[in-house]
Amino acid sequence: MKLNRSGLLAALLGVALVATAAPLKTDPAKSTVSAVFKQMNVPVEAPFKKFSAQIDYDAAKPDLAKASVEIDTASLDVGEAEMNKEVAKKDWFNSAQFPKASFVSSAIKSAGAGKLSVTGKLTIKGKSNDVSFPLTVKSEGGKQVFEGALPIKRLAYSVGEGEWKDTSMVADEVTIKFRVTAGQ
């Protein structure tokens, strides 16, 4: 049987489309990313005001999912204008040199009904580490809602240098908490 080039191309494109998850459009108004940490042993939750997420997800084929997130490091809002400027400086995020923190998934696996196990690379301040975390996914108002929390050690990413390496003031443990709403 002879297959012409355009027929072969159409067949290959059809296979490629079947083998990927659907790209979703994130809803920034209904999405949040925040850093949760302790300062002088007092819990603080500080939102990042600017971030973007790209999610390819099909509930019927979760293992084909992909996700990436970029966070504007200078957009962390710790609740006080002077402190917001401080965390953008060199000792903390060094936002002038490293304006973005990012996460790119390498594998997303089903972990039961409404649960996913995510593995990927987290990059903050030019330092990258492999990370894994669970997340939940549910349908809400015709959209998918992805929620999770990723615990990290801030010093592994050089966030808090100089006098700020002292973890008695700001704990080394930080949880990146997120809720991303996305739909077609």
Label every PLM stretch briefly.
Residues M1-A10:
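Bacterial N-terminal signal peptides that target proteins for export
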Residues L12-T20:
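Hydrophobic h-region of N-terminal signal peptides that target proteins for export
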Residues T20-Q184:
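Low-complexity, acidic/polar, glycine-enriched regions of mature
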